[in-house]
């Protein structure tokens, strides 16, 4: 299973500098092995809400992007539900203070780790660094820059 955090998923449905590279990378992965979590969906909704609040996009545009994400997820992704074990593992990761993790990123890593993801993809440099410290198979998957 290949797990994706919100930073990697967002460029699939909204225009970002990494959109083309992310799309190309995703097209080369085996179907049926792509996963996100319910937390990813919540975090993405928060991203859109922040963009609306800051005036970066209109509410109607946010609704369209959100609907597009729902379609992409429905067609291509397994959606994992966080469990009590995931929260416990996330707390354990957060107690490793050298990682610099925030709660949401720790939860992504815990969910992916508990589901034995072959790869965890993120465009968040801090999360990638933390995942490597924790011995997890985290990578950007694409050239960042």
PLM region spans:
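Acidic, PIN/NYN-like endoribonuclease modules and their adjacent C-terminal/linker elements
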Residues: 1, 71, 109, 114-145
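Short active-site oxyanion
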Residues: 31-34, 77-78, 114-119
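Acidic catalytic patch
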Residues: 41, 70-97
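Aromatic- and histidine-enriched alpha-helix N-cap/loop-to-helix transition segments
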Residues: 36-42, 104-107
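Short, well-structured N-terminal submotif of metal-dependent ribonuclease cores
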Residues: 1-40, 51-64, 145
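Alpha-helix capping/helix-boundary segments
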Residues: 40, 86, 108, 126-127
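Conserved glycosyltransferase catalytic-site signature
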Residues: 6, 105-106, 124
């Amino acid at each position: 299973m290949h797990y994706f955090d919100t930073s990697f998923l967002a460029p699939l449905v909204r225009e970002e500098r990494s959109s083309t590279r992310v799309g190309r990378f995703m097209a080369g992965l085996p179907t049926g092995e792509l996963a996100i979590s319910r937390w990813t969906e919540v975090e993405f909704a928060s991203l859109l809400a922040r963009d609306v609040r800051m005036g970066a996009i209109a509410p109607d545009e946010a609704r369209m992007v959100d609907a597009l994400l729902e379609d992409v997820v429905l067609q291509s992704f397994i959606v994992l539900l966080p469990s009590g074990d995931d929260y416990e593992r996330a707390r354990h990761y957060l107690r490793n203070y050298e990682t610099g993790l925030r709660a949401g990123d720790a939860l992504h890593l815990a969910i992916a780790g508990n589901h034995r993801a072959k790869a965890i993809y993120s465009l968040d440099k801090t999360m990638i660094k933390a995942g490597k410290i924790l011995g997890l198979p985290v990578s950007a998957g694409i050239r960042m820059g």
